[in-house]
Amino acid sequence: SARHRREPQWVDSKKVTHLDFSNDQLVGVSASLIPFLEHDDATRALMGANMLRQSCPLISPSPAKVFTGMESAAAMSSGYILRAKGPGKIKSVSPQDADGGSQITIEYDKAQVLDETGKESKQHVLSLRRYARSNQSTVIDQKPVVRAGQRVKKHEILTDGPGIKNGELALGQNLTVALMSLDGYNFEDSIVVSERIAKLGLLDSVQIEKFECVARRTRLGEEIITADIPNEDDSLLANLTKDGIVRVGTEVGQGQLLVGKLTPKPEKERTPEEKLIWKIMNQKGSDMRNTSLRMPTGEHGVVIRVDTLSKEDSGVELRPGVLQKVDVYVAIKRRLTVGDKLAGRHGNKGVVSTILPEEDMPYLSDGTPVDVILNPLGVPSRMNIGQLMELHLGWASKHSGKRAKVPVFNGCSMETIQDELERNGLRRDGKSIVYDGRTGARLENDVVVGVMSIMKLNHLAEAKVHARSIG
């Protein structure tokens, strides 16, 4: 089979003039990250490729045990990884500065870069992007992986980025997965998760939420941003600067002030007594309403950045009627909760239905409890058999201590995986004897247990909670 004018057809081998040099050429970057892609139905492979883009960068990700080899190429092309231009020594790694960045200074053995004057120089200063907010509210963080005084070789990796570990794409965690049902808790793609994952923070991520406060010119007068707010609790005002804006580094919880703001009251809102006192005492404070920006209900985080824009600033264009605009960026830790969406790389997605205590999870003969329980009915009709092959090879990989490379359209056969399982003292069918964690009784049938890379997608339950007081 060959392609002629983009159409596949059967031709004589002597007429073939060109040859694809890589199996990855057939698919895009996302699809080339799916191991055993050739064993997945096309619709599920498409879902898997799309969901790779929706994954949350985890606080401590781990590279997949079963990988395709394209992970490092994708990470290198992301633009977040910085590499040494030549052999040299790290002079310093500066902490995060006021602008939210940090720097790595390298002293190369030979002149490798040009300085500000255009002369060749041995010293190279690299600026890093730390704790920036992406359009999906996730964290963009170029983490230094070198330290001061360390020797580096040419092309050695100096930084990791979001979803990158040791210069390789790491979008999830390698978890022990069992394919079995558990009292209906994994009915219709629901997922049962062990409390161990929540306790260790294996699937924890950080969201950076942006809260905006605008002072406008109204009919009744100008709104003012100030720390001098009447009838407000002193403990809430303590975190504000003299300008009325929360300090960077402050830990804020629900209802706490981010920006203090007063808005002029309409005439009809004042009682006759207030009007009289206002006339006699000429009190402006009582003529203002407290419209401060507060932390929303149920949220808790740390203020990492504050941006202030004013009409007086040169080169700043604000909307008509806006006098001042304050943006407060708060880093919020998102722990794994019921309702979060998890997915593998084969379009096998689901929602966490319950987080069971570690001791209640099914366990193996050696006492190891499983981390995740998936429904076996999610495999036959979806025809994404790649997840089963990943489970088995991941299980063999865990016991051998080696990672398994499975390039797209060039992966190993089921017989090879079975041989690898046998070589590591495991059953050829990939099944294990499993005991019920609640009763200690052995399950009637043996269960497929393996290791799969599981991602947390950017559809978090905490961000989707809505409430209505009426209607």
What are these regions (language model features)?
Residues 1-147, 153-336, 340, 417, ...:
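Long, charge-dense accessory insertions within large macromolecular proteins
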Residues 119-132, 352-371:
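Flexible glycine/proline-rich, aromatic-decorated loop/lid segments
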Residues 282, 389-471:
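Long C-terminal interaction/binding lobes of large macromolecular proteins
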Residues 169, 184, 197-202, 346-349, ...:
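Structural and coupling elements of P-loop NTPases
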Residues 268, 344-351:
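Conserved actuator
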Residues 108-112, 183, 195, 264, ...:
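A short beta-strand motif that forms part of the nucleic acid-binding face
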Residues 183-185, 310, 335, 348-349, ...:
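Conserved nucleotide-binding/hydrolysis micro-motifs of P-loop NTPases
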